[in-house]
């Protein structure tokens, strides 16, 4: 879909406006933490024309969020070095109303995909540090256990490290709840990869894929994530009085 055309920009604005109107009237309005106005816009690796259009759309999105008193969630658009690229724009925004969205795959979609655990963990730590230092909260809006090693012990460490580190800023959302195995993988990944996207398959104790960390509510979330052998360090402390 040519999202960057004027016609589709206008259609998107109509859809987003209607979404805000609907959300503000919804009975569960109070639990909404943020609104994504466009998911994973493809800027063609930072094409200047596309990024300019995207920035304008994000400025408009922020105005709508302010109007309806709902924070907006803005994806980086796959530009090179996204945290550096968007730092100036995000520095101008209200961090209580704008959330930066990243969909990290520190052991997948790389060239080449890393197979050394030290490299994989360091990739996660780098993401955590960038999120901690960013001018607005960063949500890891899509992540998974997918990796190129496919060993349960490494996958468990990989999951634990991501859960603990991605909470340093705006939190995270795992992708996704369940992936069904297909006998005809035309578009989807092979079974040994697809299962690492599947939370349901990684929750059972002793499963062969990797153990997803289970929070039982007996401690604070911070204490829980700090208990997961956090290879990147413990969650930072913030002074909320300033």
Language-model-detected regions and their locations in the chain:
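Alpha-helix initiation/capping motif
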Residues: 5, 115-116, 148, 222, ...
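Substrate-binding cleft of secreted/luminal carbohydrate-active enzymes
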Residues: 131-223, 227-230
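Extracellular glycoside hydrolase catalytic/binding regions
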Residues: 14, 21-27, 34, 38-168
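Substrate-binding cleft of extracellular glycoside hydrolase catalytic domains
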Residues: 1-18
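Non-catalytic C-terminal accessory domains or segments of carbohydrate-active enzymes
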Residues: 225-242
